[in-house]
Amino acid sequence: MFDLGWTELLVIGVVALIVVGPKDLPKLFRNVGRFVGKARGMAREFSRAMEDAADEAGVSDIQKTFKTATNPMGSAMDSVKQATRDLTDSIDPTKFDPESETGKLAADRAENAKKIQAATARAAADRMAREAAEAAAKAEEAEAALSATPASTASSDSETKA
């Protein structure tokens, strides 16, 4: 909003500490925080009111029409996405009659899909556990090598001094 970096904020904080003093500084920051919060709330409320007014006036419909006119490829993709959504909604297994053959098959498919998802999740968890164990083993090897290295360098240092 004000495009202030950390260094600018630090300078402002130091100046505020000098001007206000350490005793009243927390109160000042609290009041500034409240003010900023209220200002953001008012800005959000204003934006929401403007969007509501635009929706009531039909600006969003006009905007959609302009978008369609200026970007025919995007509007075609939007219609494809909408058709896909409609198709997936129509295939939803919960919408079939559970007593019909289609409903029974859909329920079986949904159950099998859940089993597959559970097996996949279990396999992923096993793989992650295996990788974590391998990483821990590598870390232990590295620590062992690291602890062995100073001892060998210390003995070589004593040999060079003698």
UniProtKB/Swiss-Prot annotation:
Q: Which InterPro entries match?
A: TatA/B/E, TatB
Give positions of region: Disordered.
69-111, 124-162
User: A GO biological process this protein is involved in?
Assistant: protein transport by the Tat complex
Q: Which UniProt keywords apply?
A: Cell inner membrane, Cell membrane, Membrane, Protein transport, Translocation, Transmembrane, Transmembrane helix, Transport
What family is this protein classified in?
Belongs to the TatB family.
Instruction: Please give the GO cellular component terms listed in this UniProt entry.
Output: TAT protein transport complex
Principal location listed in the UniProt entry: membrane
Q: Which PANTHER family match?
A: SEC-INDEPENDENT PROTEIN TRANSLOCASE PROTEIN TATA, CHLOROPLASTIC
Determine the domain of life of the protein's source. Answer: Bacteria
- Know the name of this protein? Sec-independent protein translocase protein TatB
The subcellular location is: Cell inner membrane
A Pfam family in this protein? TatA_B_E
Summary of subunit composition and partner proteins: The Tat system comprises two distinct complexes: a TatABC complex, containing multiple copies of TatA, TatB and TatC subunits, and a separate TatA complex, containing only TatA subunits. Substrates initially bind to the TatABC complex, which probably triggers association of the separate TatA complex to form the active translocon.
The answer to whether UniProt assigns keyword Hydrolase to this entry is no
- HAMAP family, per the entry: TatB (MF_00237)
Record's function text: Part of the twin-arginine translocation (Tat) system that transports large folded proteins containing a characteristic twin-arginine motif in their signal peptide across membranes. Together with TatC, TatB is part of a receptor directly interacting with Tat signal peptides. TatB may form an oligomeric binding site that transiently accommodates folded Tat precursor proteins before their translocation.
Q: Where is the composition biased (Basic and acidic residues)?
A: 83-111, 124-141
Q: What spans are recorded as compositionally biased (Low complexity)?
A: 144-155
Q: According to its record, how does it sit in the membrane? A: Single-pass membrane protein
| KW Transport (keyword) present | yes
- Enumerate the transmembrane spans: 1-21
Q: Give the molecular function GO annotations.
A: protein transmembrane transporter activity
